[in-house]
Amino acid sequence: KKYNAIVLRIEPDIESDDKVYRDIVTNLGYKIKDNAKDFKDEIQPRYVFRLDIKGKTEEEIMAGFHQKWRYNIRLAAKKGVEVREGTREDLKAFHKIMVETGSRDGFIIRPLEYFEKMYDNLAPEHMKLLMAYYDNEPISGVIPIFYGNKTWYLYGASSNKHRNLMPNY
């Protein structure tokens, strides 16, 4: 009420069916939204998958991927897709690709200003922008965020151009 807020959304790194968590949250008067049918119902996904890479080599990590993922990763590298760390200025290109992705896949896109504020507040310690290029043209991007010893793939975007190069892998 103090800030005229309508909704407070929290997404703790806790299993959603954790009884202790659910009891605490509901006893505090909050509601738990479990009814999102798919990604199109939300602006951010409700569930995440986790991959423990601690102490593993790149080869061991790759071996844990589905065969088709390994193929696509190697194909992108072989075809000349290059991944570079982006700057705040590269957010415009990322956002343009994100709009293209949202239009193609039917999900809501946050405005450029959201990504700029996120970058200003989190980069470089807790956020990166990684962009994939083909012939120096940005064709894909990802925003991972870091906290403690964990990384979350928060946003990803891929252009309709050069999709056959598998830049999002």
Regions from the language model: what does each represent?
Residues 12-17, 27-164:
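A conserved beta-strand-loop-helix scaffold within acyl/acetyltransferase catalytic domains
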Residues 1, 163-169:
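Conserved acetyl-CoA-binding loop-helix of GNAT-fold acetyltransferases
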Residues 19-22:
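Extracellular disulfide-rich cysteine clusters
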Residues 3-14:
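Conserved GNAT acetyl-CoA-binding A-motif
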